[in-house]
Amino acid sequence: MTKPFKGVIKLDVRDSKPDWTPYELKKAPAGAPNVLIVLYDDTGLASWSPFGGRINMPTLQKLADSGLMYSQWHTTALCSPSRSTFLTGRNHNVNRCASIMEATDGFPGAAGRLPAECATIGQVLQDNGYSTFWLGKNHNVPTEDTASGASKSEWPLQKGFDRFYGFIGGETNNWYPTLVEDNRYVDQPSTPEQGYHLSKDLADQALRMLRDQQSANPSKPWFMWFCPGANHAPHHSPKAYADKYRGKFDDGYEAYREWVLPRMIEKGLFPSDTALTPINPMPKAVADTVPGDAVRPWNSLNDDEKKLFSRMAEVYAGFSEYTDAQVGRIIEYLEQTRQLENTLIFYCAD
């Protein structure tokens, strides 16, 4: 509702008094913190080193050592619903996001379009004096709206974000991604032969946005939603990072479970009497109805299969650590510009 005019209008401008207050944008409170959320994809609690896992995460470890590590964390185990709840603070069914965007069905809880009453954190903060940035994955646009000529009503700039750079959908090629900047598709800035990787590109763009913010309006707080392609398939890691894990997973996935559980108990993440679930928790009669829906015992694999699955784990781990290094560049910039102490950082996965 428009605020009433409180100025004075006389016959002569010299006797009149303007009133700009109805048009002033709301400012954030003095000292309001910046907020950075780093949201990985498809990553289990037992993967990362701060939680006892084998994947080295120096940036996350640094933040965990000086912060708080949560042991209670709920996701829907699907991209779109989890991200909708994070963006709005509301149940995913209330958000009409019961499943991924490719599975919307037109029913009230799964229509894929956010109700107007479900404001995003971007909209709330934007209306209260924040700059808002979204980088990386956006799996909250209905499939029929992903084309360049389709409706943009569910795209980030229409959901409270000043800037967006990333991709729309569940996954993309990290060497040759389908990129979107704001409301348009764009070409990637370089090739893999020139050193391109999506995780690095996202960090580059995040730093560019933050530098622009600092030069244009350094007193204005910002919110950044940083969602890399990691660790969702396709798993694309620079070879040097994948090779750091050569042989680290040769003992197999069953042995890894046995190895990591005591470490997680020691860190206080699980009660001391926690036992492993069966590697195939579903009854065999049920699992057999869905081809590939059961894990084969490691010792039943032949040598080529073991070699393949070990390498897949190495690439996954390298992908994760490489992306963590890119997040580290953002943290380093915040340290250099003395913003870190006034920045809330959440480092998590769906």
Region annotations inferred by a language model:
Residues 1-350:
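Formylglycine-dependent sulfatase
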